[in-house]
């Protein structure tokens, strides 16, 4: 009688952690590297594939080109300058036409910045209010960018040069991303 009512704990098998004992495949390693890169920059699969295809066409190391292209995107430059707290917030600033590049309104977050580009905030109250909580230079500004305050305490940024591998703060093996996409294209 007592045996039917109380479960015998010895009869249940102890579940082993199979994920720790199983070897991770090379596909999984490449997929994780690609997903880390994608989610860090807030890109869609198609956008990242486009950057990898551009990298294949260029001369030099194919693995170093996608991070350079991603670091030179306008939304990422605004984030690195400290004008926005996150990359999605930087995308919103650009989409809402608060950002000027070389004194021209740019509303495309994927705009590729070039050396000597000057990035400022529009001189209107709503643009200044959008940046109230942000402060330029709050974090470590990469060496390919320069952050400052212009007249009227508007945040300003300058792109000194194209980003190199040292200025990219991600711990991702870019070759794994390129290898992942070598099957697709």
Swiss-Prot record:
GO CC, alphabetical: chloroplast; small ribosomal subunit
Biological processes annotated in GO: ribosomal small subunit biogenesis; translation
Organism (species): Woodwardia radicans (Rooting chainfern)
Lineage: Eukaryota, Viridiplantae, Streptophyta, Embryophyta, Tracheophyta
Presence of keyword Chloroplast: yes
Record's function text: One of the primary rRNA binding proteins, it binds directly to 16S rRNA where it nucleates assembly of the body of the 30S subunit.
Residue ranges annotated for the S4 RNA-binding domain, each copy included: 72-134
Cellular location(s): Plastid, Chloroplast
HAMAP family, alphabetized: Ribosomal_uS4_B
Keyword tags: Chloroplast, Plastid, Ribonucleoprotein, Ribosomal protein, RNA-binding, rRNA-binding
Keyword Metal-binding assigned: no
Gene3D superfamilies found in the cross-reference section: Ribosomal Protein S4 Delta 41, Chain A, domain 1 (1.10.1050.10), RNA-binding S4 domain (3.10.290.10)
NCBIfam families membership: PRK05327.1
Oligomer status and interactors: Part of the 30S ribosomal subunit. Contacts protein S5. The interaction surface between S4 and S5 is involved in control of translational fidelity.
Protein name, as recorded: Small ribosomal subunit protein uS4c
Residue ranges of the region described as Disordered: 132-154
Family: Belongs to the universal ribosomal protein uS4 family.
SMART domains associated with the record: Ribosomal_S4, S4
Alphabetical list of Pfam families matching this protein: Ribosomal_S4 (PF00163), S4 (PF01479)
């Amino acid at each position: 009688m007592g045996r039917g009512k109380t479960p015998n704990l010895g009869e249940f098998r102890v579940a082993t952690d199979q994920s720790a004992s199983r070897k991770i495949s090379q596909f999984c390693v490449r997929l994780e590297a690609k997903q880390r890169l994608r989610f860090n920059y807030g890109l869609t699969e198609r956008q990242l594939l486009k950057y990898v295809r551009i990298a294949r066409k260029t001369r030099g190391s194919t693995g170093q080109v996608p991070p350079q292209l991603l670091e030179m995107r306008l939304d990422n430059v605004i984030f690195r300058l400290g004008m926005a707290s996150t990359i999605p917030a930087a995308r919103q600033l650009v989409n809402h036409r608060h950002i000027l590049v070389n004194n021209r309104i740019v509303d495309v977050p994927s705009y590729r910045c070039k050396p000597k580009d000057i990035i400022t905030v529009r001189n209107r109250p709503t643009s200044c209010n959008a940046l109230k909580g942000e402060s330029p230079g709050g974090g470590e500004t990469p060496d390919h960018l320069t952050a400052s305050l212009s007249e009227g305490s508007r945040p300003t940024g300058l792109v000194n040069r194209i980003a190199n591998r040292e200025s990219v703060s991600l711990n991702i093996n870019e070759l794994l991303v390129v290898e992942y996409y070598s099957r697709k294209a």
